[in-house]
Amino acid sequence: MFNLFKKKQIPSINHQHKNLLISLPLNWKYEFEEGDQEACFDPKSQSTLRLNVIKVTPPEGKTPEENIKDLTVNQPYVTTSKGYLLTKPAYRESLEDGNNITLVTWKLINYDGDEKTIAVLSYTVLSEEKDSEQEKEIFNLLENSLQNSELLN
């Protein structure tokens, strides 16, 4: 017997932006923006995910713990299934073009080697829509995708 109440998963594909390989919704569109950043969005929604990948070299003389604190900006983090550091989402409310928006930001950090790769993902959603069923599904997909994403060399 099948479950009539089982939620249908959002169809997704693997998407690569620079060194970041992440699973995102199949129907999303992609645009490059200024500063080597990429915007990803559902054409039927006003929400946007921005991807930015940077490489940094921590200063010499700091302990690994101090470097992690600097890279995560002292945010709580977890270690993903691939061994990367993933900061917990940081929320910021703002006003943009007369609309209340919520900006949710994650950092995915490859801590191996001398040069560290950091993927910064920022999801912008209208504050009035952030608790909608659709946005909750997208948010869960992003969280799960980040847990399984890769930062390629």
Describe the function of each predicted region.
Residues K55-P58, T72-Y77, N153:
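A general structural signal for short secondary-structure boundary/capping elements
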Residues L4, S12-D70, S94-L95:
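Secretory pathway targeting signatures of secreted, lumenal, and periplasmic proteins
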Residues W28, V120-N153:
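Surface-exposed amphipathic alpha-helical segments
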Residues N67-I118:
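Signature of long, low-cysteine stretches enriched in small and polar/charged residues
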Residues S47-R50, T87-K88, T117-Y123:
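Glycine-rich, often proline-containing surface loops adjacent to acidic residues and nearby aromatics
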